[in-house]
Amino acid sequence: MKKIYLDYAATTPVDPRVENAMLPFFSKKFGNTMSLHSFGQDAKLALEQSRETVADLIGAKANEIIFTSSATESNNLALKGSAFEASTELSRMSMPKSHYAGHIIISSIEHHCVVEAAKWLSRGFEVTKIPVDKYGTVNPKDIEREIRPETILVSIIHGSNEIGTIQNISEIGKICRQKKVCFHTDASQSFGKILIDVKKMNIDLLTASSHKIYGPKGVGLLYVREGIKLVPLLHGGGQENGLRSSTVNVAAIVGFAKACEIYKKGAKSENQRLIRLRDKLIKEILKIKGSRLNGHPKNRLPNNVNVRFDFVEGESLVIHLDLHGVACSTGSACSSATLEPSHVLLATGLRHEEAHGSLRITLGRWTTEKDINYLLNVLPKVVGKIREISPFKN
């Protein structure tokens, strides 16, 4: 039985061209970038060339790119680094102790690593969660209303990893710049899928991940706009402008850069192809009785389809589809193994049973029309079969 992978939002296979670019850095150009000899300098050159390639994709300067081990680390560095810097600055100003805690704003549909980092910081900082509408869209005016003098950071996800909704990051960034508040966006799902310009979009901090764009796991980035100060989470040799001490993973970073290069060359045509397949999938799935689309009908990532079915559990759908050779998910790969309903879907106003009946299908570079047709043939049968035995039906 042929297996069809439709869970590209969870992770992507490494592109063979990326693999080939990485190979020399495992056994030939393996030097430590901090070493003065030729092995180290060759590695250092590859690192800096990769930094330039990645920076170019988002309109940043090379020195504004900090390589990390993952999007989770980048998001933690953005939130905690900003919070610790604010505390340090207040301490320098000899502010009263009661004034030490600043204010952080996030949305109610952030990735778990942002939610948990903010929760951890709430022991010393006030955290406000901005609600979303039924499509999972944040109203920039709600953010503007919540910003106050002690607000140190606004962190809003760019493209939802679960429902695919794209936020108006440019408008949010403009508001934050006018209010002189640092603005971070988690672009883990949008980076390498839609065009991003950090300068035009008024972004101060941006998170991205390699394994979401056909690069290797174990490497991510944090864009840090020139002039933005963060306190590092890791202390040691002072790599990555002192913000991320550790021996640099050159092979993975080279792979990340190659993945960015490949995306940039074919971005327009690939996005159009994915949108065509996505829209076909949505149109045909919504013909199934009791089906509804989650997320915004238009402002969504080009590869994301998230639907729900009356009287059908998402976990059952995933298992039955897997038996037919199709890999999908119920939501975020970081939480879909639990039985808890998605906090993202609940934030859009769905009831628990509706959130439990959702299925996320995400397309990618190797998704074909034939794959989509196969899923469209199998899915109605699977939904009908599960519905027949559903305890919720009557």
Label each residue range with its predicted role:
Residues 1-394:
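Pyridoxal 5′-phosphate
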